[in-house]
UniProtKB/Swiss-Prot annotation:
Keywords: Cell membrane, Disease variant, Intellectual disability, Membrane, Neurodegeneration, Phosphoprotein, Spinocerebellar ataxia, Synapse, Transmembrane, Transmembrane helix. Belongs to the TMEM240 family. It is linked to Spinocerebellar ataxia 21: A form of spinocerebellar ataxia, a clinically and genetically heterogeneous group of cerebellar disorders. Patients show progressive incoordination of gait and often poor coordination of hands, speech and eye movements, due to degeneration of the cerebellum with variable involvement of the brainstem and spinal cord. SCA21 is characterized by onset in the first decades of life of slowly progressive relatively mild cerebellar ataxia associated with slight extrapyramidal features predominant in older patients and cognitive impairment predominant in younger patients. The chain crosses the membrane at residues 5-25, 90-110. This is Transmembrane protein 240.
């Protein structure tokens, strides 16, 4: 039950990331570029936009190799083989959200494997000591106290008085 809840959480997180990208960037420009430059290369030699988004308009498609072609969209309109621009944009957005969601689920699995490995080997191995410091929010704000060095290279140990909860006293620095 908890695995499916985690999967749903990461799916929702992936959809939120896609929505944030769409709000922060000009997603229409990205989808228009995909629609006008990439799809004509995939559809054939004539480089015609076979969509019905503008039947009576002339589409100027400039491919990457530099030729410029002017095509009347009303001559190349196919009812059965065409997919509208909105459907392509929807499929592209869903695919992007799906990929981001599965990436987040994979990252969740990697983190769980790392935590399991750390818990299994923490008594015997010191290589996973960074993980609890990384995951602990309480330790995130604290700076590690390092001993100061004198100019001669001798170590000077600074002794601080601490409160009962482990925080340094501001009066005895």
């Amino acid at each position: 039950m908890s695995m499916s809840a985690n999967t749903m959480i990461f799916m929702i997180l992936g959809a939120s990331v896609v929505m944030a990208i769409a709000c922060l960037m000009d997603m229409n420009a990205l989808l228009d570029r995909f629609h006008n430059y990439i799809l004509p290369h995939l559809r054939g030699e004539d480089r015609v936009c076979h969509c019905n988004c503008g039947r009576h308009h002339i589409h100027y498609v400039i491919p990457y190799d530099g030729d410029q072609s002017v095509v009347d969209a009303s001559e190349n309109y196919f009812v059965t083989d065409s997919v509208t621009k909105q459907e392509i944009d929807l499929m592209l957005g869903l695919l992007l959200g799906f990929c981001i969601s599965w990436f987040l689920v994979w990252m969740d699995g990697v983190l769980h494997c790392a935590v399991r490995a750390w818990r299994a080997g923490r008594r015997y191995d010191g290589s996973w000591t960074w993980l609890p410091k990384l995951c602990s929010l309480r330790e995130l704000g604290r700076r590690p106290h390092r001993p100061f060095e004198e100019a001669a290279g001798n170590m000077v140990h600074v002794k601080q008085k601490l409160y009962h909860n482990g925080h340094p006293s501001p009066r005895h620095l």
